Amino acid sequence: MATRNPPPQDYESDDDSYEVLDLTEYARRHQWWNRVFGHSSGPMVEKYSVATQIVMGGVTGWCAGFLFQKVGKLAATAVGGGFLLLQIASHSGYVQIDWKRVEKDVNKAKRQIKKRANKAAPEINNLIEEATEFIKQNIVISSGFVGGFLLGLAS
């Protein structure tokens, strides 16, 4: 038994309208934590007392500062040791540095960085605005984090 297919419908019509969405404005209006955690998350720390917020920020800041200090010491030791070995090798005659070539390469790198910095400025400004807004909305826990971070660096 043969079935009869209906004629194809014309889906394009004059009354179809589409809304144009500007993604840059959308991104500015919607905070990054809403995109990651959903709209119901919000700043959860506002539910806690000021003392609890300061303690939470202080403890997380201290942990971050302590880890930053340990990793920073290791990185500084590695970089400093590398420079020391390079200096010894240069003084002993194993390595000769072509300073004109180094200067040329550094100037080339500076030009490339300036070009890239001019292109990335809007994205960086948007990120800075979001971070500033986050800090303003959560000033208590942010100040606790900064204090804890500095204590973690000192310990």
Curated annotation (Swiss-Prot):
Phosphorylation at Ser-13 by CK2 and at Tyr-18 by SRC inhibits activation of mitophagy. Following hypoxia, dephosphorylated at Tyr-18, leading to interaction with MAP1 LC3 family proteins and triggering mitophagy. Dephosphorylation is mediated by PGAM5. Phosphorylated by ULK1 at Ser-17 which enhances FUNDC1 binding to LC3. Widely expressed. Pfam families: FUN14 (PF04930). The modification Phosphotyrosine is found at Y18. Residues 69-74, 155 are mitochondrial intermembrane. Changing Y18W: Abolishes phosphorylation by SRC. Integral mitochondrial outer-membrane protein that mediates the formation of mitochondria-associated endoplasmic reticulum membranes (MAMs). In turn, mediates angiogenesis and neoangiogenesis through interference with intracellular Ca(2+) communication and regulation of the vascular endothelial growth factor receptor KDR/VEGFR2 expression at both mRNA and protein levels. Also acts as an activator of hypoxia-induced mitophagy, an important mechanism for mitochondrial quality and homeostasis, by interacting with and recruiting LC3 protein family to mitochondria. It is a multi-pass membrane protein. It is found in: Mitochondrion outer membrane. Belongs to the FUN14 family. Residues 1-47, 96-133 are cytoplasmic. Keywords: Autophagy, Isopeptide bond, Membrane, Mitochondrion, Mitochondrion outer membrane, Phosphoprotein, Transmembrane, Transmembrane helix, Ubl conjugation. PANTHER family: FUN14 DOMAIN CONTAINING (PTHR21346), FUN14 DOMAIN-CONTAINING PROTEIN 1 (PTHR21346:SF2). The modification Phosphoserine is found at S13, S17. The chain crosses the membrane at residues 48-68, 75-95, 134-154. The YXXL motif mediates the interaction with MAP1 LC3 family proteins MAP1LC3A, MAP1LC3B and GABARAP. The lineage of its organism: Eukaryota, Metazoa, Chordata, Craniata, Vertebrata. Changing V20A: Significantly impaired mitophagy-inducing ability. Interacts (via YXXL motif) with MAP1 LC3 family proteins MAP1LC3A, MAP1LC3B and GABARAP. Interacts with DNM1L/DPR1. Interacts with GPX4. One of its GO terms (biological process) is mitochondrial fusion. It comes from Homo sapiens (Human). There is a cross-link at K119 (Glycyl lysine isopeptide (Lys-Gly) (interchain with G-Cter in ubiquitin)). One of its GO terms (cellular component) is mitochondrion. This is FUN14 domain-containing protein 1. The gene is FUNDC1. A motif (YXXL) lies at residues 18-21.
